[in-house]
Amino acid sequence: MNPSEMQRKAPPRRRRHRNRAPSSHKMNKMMMSEEQMKLPSTNKAEPLTWAQLNKLTQLATKCLENTKMTQTPESMLLAALMIVSTVSAGVPNSSEETVTIENGP
């Protein structure tokens, strides 16, 4: 080996780590007020009554029985959310029970 090959090579220079998060000044500009976030089509819903909650529980139970799933708290919650989302989306259903939840007892 000749002396030039024996020289120790310098390690490659490391790049400095740059913080990729936006600065707080930019974040303050991005923040919107609550009034700006509200859409004109936002409607307030009436509070849920106990009768509606009981009916929702019955529908969720019936849904789980139809699908032959076990009644766990998690599956009951998912069934109730499915029913609420179906009713709020306005999906037509021939069942009178969903109309009862939609219009109240």
UniProtKB/Swiss-Prot annotation:
Entry function: Retroviral replication requires the nuclear export and translation of unspliced, singly-spliced and multiply-spliced derivatives of the initial genomic transcript. Rec interacts with a highly structured RNA element (RcRE) present in the viral 3'LTR and recruits the cellular nuclear export machinery. This permits export to the cytoplasm of unspliced genomic or incompletely spliced subgenomic viral transcripts.
Any one Gene Ontology BP term: mRNA transport
Disordered: region residues: 1-41
Residue ranges, compositional bias (Basic residues): 10-20
Organism of derivation: Homo sapiens (Human)
This protein's UniProt keywords: Cytoplasm, ERV, mRNA transport, Nucleus, RNA-binding, Transport, Transposable element
GO cellular component terms attached to this protein's record: cytoplasm; nucleolus
Subcellular location field: Cytoplasm; Nucleus, Nucleolus
Domain of life of the source: Eukaryota
Segments carrying motif Nuclear export signal: 50-59
Protein name listed in UniProt: Endogenous retrovirus group K member 16 Rec protein
Motif (Nuclear localization signal): 13-20
Recorded GO MF terms: RNA binding
Miscellaneous field: Despite functional similarity, Rec shares almost no sequence homology with HIV-1 Rev and HTLV-1 Rex. Has a type 2 genome. The HERV-K(HML-2) family contains type 1 and type 2 genomes depending on the absence or presence of 292 nucleotides at the 5'-end of the env gene. Rec proteins are translated from a doubly spliced transcript expressed exclusively by HERV-K(HML-2) type 2 proviral genomes. The first exon comprises the 87 N-terminal amino acids of the HERV-K(HMLM-2) type 2 envelope protein. The second exon (18 amino acids) is positioned in the 3' part of the proviral genome.
Quaternary data: Forms homodimers, homotrimers, and homotetramers via a C-terminal domain. Associates with XPO1 and with ZNF145.
Keyword match NADP: no
